[in-house]
A protein has these predicted regions:
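Short amphipathic alpha-helices and their capping/turn segments at secondary-structure boundaries
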Residues: 22-24, 91-99, 130-133
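N-terminal, active-site-proximal structural segment of metallo-dependent hydrolase catalytic domains
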Residues: 1-52, 58, 66-68
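Surface-exposed beta-strand edges and their flanking turn/coil or helix-capping segments
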Residues: 18-21, 72, 84, 116-119
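Short, flexible loop segments at the rims of nucleotide/cofactor-binding pockets, characterized by
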Residues: 7-13, 81-83, 123-127
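Short, contiguous clusters of charged residues that form electrostatic/catalytic patches at enzyme active sites
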Residues: 15-18, 128-132
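Structured beta-strand-rich core segments of catalytic domains in phosphoester-bond hydrolases
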Residues: 37-40, 44-113
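Surface-exposed cleft-lining segments at the edges of enzyme active sites
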Residues: 109-130
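Generic low-complexity, intrinsically disordered sequence content enriched
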Residues: 28, 74-75, 131
Length: 133
């Protein structure tokens, strides 16, 4: 089964919901993966996307930072997500399609300007996250 998939580091899904609607209308991918949603799941404006035919969503989120979501025209189910590096940062979600295909959506922050684990905690966290992938 062929399908189209788009991915977008949205940097706040609520702030850019109108742009998401434009993308869904003009490009109409079957599946859209969003990173850095910066929103608790219950605050994602799913109803706006559902009105455009994207009736399925799986997501992980938290207020103010990180967060990932998968919007789909096709039926998907929540197949979990890993807590890489034990950070509890809502950076990974898995959607499973009816045919068993799994879509993994990750948000991996840049890790800061100093590429040194000792001098930059965030860089060390990024290395730990990537190692566990």
């Amino acid at each position: 089964m062929a399908f189209t998939l788009a991915t977008w580091n949205i940097n706040s899904v609520r702030l850019r919901a109108g742009l998401v609607e434009k993308l869904l209308t003009e490009e109409a991918p079957d599946i859209l993966c969003l990173q850095e949603t910066k929103s608790p799941v219950d605050k994602i404006p799913f109803e706006r996307f559902e009105a455009l035919g994207y009736g399925h969503m799986v997501a992980r989120g938290q207020k103010g930072y990180n967060g990932v979501a998968i919007l789909s025209k096709l039926p998907i189910e929540d197949a979990g997500g890993a807590n890489y590096a034990s950070l509890n940062h809502a950076r990974h979600v898995i959607a499973r399609m009816e045919n068993g295909v799994e879509i993994h959506n990750h948000y991996i922050p840049a890790g800061g300007d100093t590429p040194d684990r000792e001098a930059n905690v965030k860089f060390g966290q990024k290395l730990d996250y990537l190692t566990e992938l």
